Amino acid sequence: MDKSLFEQARPILEQIQDNGFEAYYVGGSVRDYVMGRNIHDIDITTSATPDEIESIFSHTIPVGKEHGTINVVFNDENYEVTTFRAEEDYVDHRRPSGVTFVRDLYEDLQRRDFTMNAIAMDTAYKLYDYFDGQQDINNRIIRTVGIAEERFQEDALRMIRCLRFQSQLSFDIAMETFEAMRTQMADIKFLSIERIVIELTKLMRGINVEESFNHLKSLKAFNYMPYFEQLDMNQINVTEPIDLELLIAIVSVKFDINYSLKPLKLSNRQVKDINQYIQIMNALPSIITKEQLKMFVYDYDTNLIKNVMVAADVLKANDIQGHEPLIVNLQTIDETLHRLPMHNRKDMMVNGGVLMAHLNAKSGPWLKDVLRQIEIAIVTGKVSNEETEILKWVDNHVKI
């Protein structure tokens, strides 16, 4: 069992303890340690208040001081240190109206979402498990701490997180937890779409995504999400892990729609990837020659092309025609990419200025068209990417 990340953080806990306070590892890192999984992020919980943490350590960042969280910078690493706290009544099913700092570990752990995430551990690797989290982990069960209805009423995102954990861990959901989700799923309409998208992104990449996605449908979760609410998501099938962006593109192609993505509040990069995925899926079935393959690899991000090809079963499950494997496969994609004479228009040895001077013509719509013709000629091997050769080819093949 790799304890290196815990050992790297140990001096922080020891320094807090040396000042008379309690300190424990908590949350996902402890859960993953119990499961024998790789540890990623270390979270620390303590009886010390934020002010007391700031007085103990010389380099701190008050990232969420009002909620009890201080970042302690130690050996060039950031560690979240959060004070034991009890939360007051929640507002809009998503955030507490306030927090009260407490000195009792049990009181802090009982406010957490699921039993598997409510285990604390000290520097001697002793576990503090008041809610049978280890037993649920051993039985591969996701169960809320306390009454499920209350946990989901406090923060409706916990329902989506539950399905995300199910997808990632291949756990079952406790019956009472699932039934509470069935009756309260409509409350996710109060959440910001940004928080939902973060969870969906992780859910879609989970090894058990098929079951979790089917639960999203059966629990009618999509009915309460912007963008998805206008679609019949029961017609969409996901059989293996894919990017959320690819899912959205599959939805667009399946229903032949061009709905605005603005309600999802995605990044520009995500929107760009979705649009490329759509174009890739629409282009794939028609690629039957090597020249078409060259232009396809040139025009689109090969990582996205590969993602679509690897997801062939998902496309098939949604009645979307895939690629011709003899022409388009992972090997031919890599070989074609390696042999391309150039990878974007910036590599081309002529530009608009050179063309206008050579043809003694003013700028106009013709210019974009001619540059594209040259691009195609170079990529498909009809002319070498040298200025003199390109201009000869233009003289022989282009009319404006």
UniProtKB/Swiss-Prot annotation:
Q: Which organism is it from?
A: Staphylococcus aureus (strain Mu3 / ATCC 700698)
Keywords from the named record = ATP-binding, Magnesium, Metal-binding, Nucleotide-binding, Nucleotidyltransferase, RNA repair, RNA-binding, Transferase, tRNA processing
Instruction: Give the family from UniProt.
Output: Belongs to the tRNA nucleotidyltransferase/poly(A) polymerase family. Bacterial CCA-adding enzyme type 3 subfamily.
- Pfam families reported for this sequence: PolyA_pol, PolyA_pol_RNAbd, tRNA_NucTran2_2
Q: Could you tell me what this protein is called?
A: CCA-adding enzyme
Residues recorded as binding Mg(2+), renumbered to this chain, are 41, 43
Gene expressing this chain: cca
Give the GO molecular function terms.
Answer: ATP binding; CCA tRNA nucleotidyltransferase activity; magnesium ion binding; tRNA binding
Q: Which residues bind CTP?
A: 28, 31, 112, 155, 158, 161, 164
Q: Which positions make up the signal peptide?
A: none
Q: Which InterPro entries match?
A: Bact_CCA-adding_enz_type3_sf (IPR050264), CCA-adding_enz_C (IPR032810), CCA-adding_enz_firmicutes (IPR023068), NT_sf (IPR043519), PolA_pol_head_dom (IPR002646), PolyA_RNA-bd (IPR032828)
What Gene3D superfamilies is this protein classified in?
1.10.246.80, Beta Polymerase, domain 2, cca-adding enzyme, domain 2
Top-rank lineage group of the source organism: Bacteria
Instruction: List the taxonomic lineage.
Output: Bacteria, Bacillati, Bacillota, Bacilli, Bacillales
